[in-house]
Regions:
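Electropositive, glycine-dotted interaction segments
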Residues: 1-125
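C-terminal lobe/lid and adjacent interdomain/linker elements of RecA-like ASCE P-loop ATPase modules
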Residues: 194-271
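Residue-level preference for the first positions of well-ordered beta-strands
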Residues: 175-177, 209
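Short, Φ-rich (hydrophobic/aromatic) sequence segments
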Residues: 55-63, 170, 183, 197
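Phosphate-binding glycine-rich loops of NTP-binding sites
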Residues: 8, 89, 157, 161-168, ...
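Conserved ABC ATPase signature
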Residues: 118, 122-170, 177-190
Length: 271
């Protein structure tokens, strides 16, 4: 990269920085001070730069955006180790686990799915399919007919989205940041508590940070006042620019809370 400043041309490289100007001086790794222009350059060797770059890459790689699309989750998928942002390969991710891990994760997924409104799913599994077992399909067993599996094509949108969120929390690397778009989409409002409890439990157990978006006042009410420091809301100014605001910094928050819940504040267009 080259930067031209007044009469000097600065060339940036991973090993060195050269200053090519009137004097024709070269600068090698170390420290260079241009007192005339009040510029200080500190340069590093390649290993340090590569290590720093690797840390940045690892940080961004551990940011996972999840917006499950039930229509795509109902199809067969390839067995793979990383969950796609649309959740379409949930079954493949489960099948890629070791037999012990797969059994454990499926048991946990099943335990969190049971309280859903249908209350008839008692087990969720994923199985390889096809001649060479390279694809996978999601199945569940219901109380209505314990011997007859139901594949993903027979599951509701809310159930599939919920399963994708649970699988993501159970399989992403610790210390990841999981961004979930419309976290309660398709889920019955009466199960907001189960959703919040699941997010709190698994994020704490797996040491995963979770950032969710929602337009559901019921879910906001379920979070409770203790979560106010962790809630933000988005507004737009007269130019149409969006701004993220901390709820705890809202003016007259105590007065607003005295007249209703967080969800009620949203319904009344107070936030």
């Amino acid at each position: 990269m080259r930067v031209i400043k007044q009469n000097s041309v600065f060339s940036f490289g991973p090993c060195e920085i050269h200053r090519l100007g009137i004097e024709g001086d070269d600068v090698v790794p170390g420290k260079f001070i241009d007192s005339a222009r009040n510029i200080t350059w500190k340069t590093y060797d390649v290993p340090i730069i590569l290590d720093f770059g690797a840390k940045i890459y690892a940080t961004f790689r551990n940011i996972i955006i999840l917006d499950p699309v039930p229509a795509k989750m109902r199809d067969y998928c390839k067995i793979s180790k990383e969950l796609k942002s649309d959740g379409s390969n949930v079954a493949g991710v489960l099948c890629a686990l070791t037999p012990e891990e797969k059994k454990k994760v499926e048991a946990l997924v099943s335990s969190y799915v049971r309280p859903l409104p249908e209350r008839d799913i008692n087990k969720v599994i994923s199985e390889p399919v096809g001649l060479i077992k390279s694809d996978a399909m999601l199945y569940c067993y219901e109380d209505w007919n314990p011997e007859q599996p139901v594949d993903a094509r027979g599951m509701s949108d809310g159930t599939l989205r919920f399963i994708a969120i649970v699988v993501a929390l159970l399989t992403v690397a610790p210390h990841s940041l999981l961004l979930i778009e419309e976290v309660d989409n398709g889920l019955h409002p009466s199960r907001a508590k189960e959703l919040v409890d699941m997010l709190k439990d698994l994020s704490r157990q797996r040491q995963v940070d979770v950032l969710c978006t929602t337009h559901n006042p019921v879910l906001l009410d379920e979070l409770g006042n203790k979560m106010i420091p962790f809630i933000s809301y988005v507004t737009r100014d007269e130019k149409g620019d969006s701004h993220v605001n901390l709820l705890e910094e809202k003016e007259n928050l105590a007065k607003l809370m005295a007249s209703g819940t967080i969800g009620r504040m949203m319904v009344n267009d107070k936030i």
